[in-house]
């Protein structure tokens, strides 16, 4: 589960307008997830991890950590006092870490219909490949980035349907 923190619609729109103008938003629209609630190996016993991000201009090197923490603190007072450790990555560092994150885009790049059904080659079932038993799933397959888990779900169903017929 992912929670979105930004305030009312005007505050959300202002944050996204700033990014569109090439500015780092003062009050970003923040997405947070606490994966350790569902996967206990992500944090020591009795502790939790929090994963978060916000939109910034393409290629930004500005550290948004303080602004993100300030937004979370608005909705969860005392949050900062509970932080034991933190790590942040700029878009440039994200791209260096994973070349698929072009410009730091964690959604796998532009989502265009013609691309979604031609990766890696044109196919009716975009998760299958010409190689038997090889399927792909990621933010670069339908329904695209931001629909957490659905790319893998659909790829698994495609694999089961195809493999069960053979």
Where are these regions (language model features)?
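Mid-domain catalytic core of redox enzymes
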Residues: 1-43
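Flavin-binding catalytic cores
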Residues: 11-29, 60-99
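A glycine-rich dinucleotide-binding beta-alpha-beta segment and adjacent secondary-structure elements
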Residues: 27-31, 78-142
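Short glycine/proline-enriched loop/turn "hinge" motifs that connect secondary-structure elements
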Residues: 40-47, 125-129
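A generic structural motif
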Residues: 56-61, 140-143
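Active-site-proximal substrate-binding core of FAD-dependent oxidoreductases
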Residues: 91-92, 160-166
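A conserved FAD-binding loop/helix module that cradles the flavin
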Residues: 137-160
């Amino acid at each position: 589960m992912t929670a979105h923190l930004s305030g009312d619609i005007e505050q959300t729109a202002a944050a996204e307008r700033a990014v569109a103008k090439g500015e780092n938003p003062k009050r970003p629209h923040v997405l947070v997830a606490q994966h350790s609630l569902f996967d206990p190996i992500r944090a020591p016993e009795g502790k939790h991890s929090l994963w978060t991000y916000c939109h910034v201009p393409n290629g930004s090197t500005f550290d948004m950590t303080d602004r993100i923490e300030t937004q979370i603190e608005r909705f969860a007072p005392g949050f900062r006092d509970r932080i034991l450790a933190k790590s942040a990555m700029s878009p440039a560092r994200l791209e260096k870490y994973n070349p698929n994150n072009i410009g730091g885009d964690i959604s796998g790049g532009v989502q265009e219909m013609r691309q979604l059904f031609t990766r890696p080659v044109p196919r009716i079932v975009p998760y299958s490949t010409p190689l038997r038993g090889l399927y792909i799933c990621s933010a670069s397959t339908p329904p695209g980035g931001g629909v957490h888990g659905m790319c893998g779900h659909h790829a698994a169903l495609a694999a089961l349907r195809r493999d069960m017929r053979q």
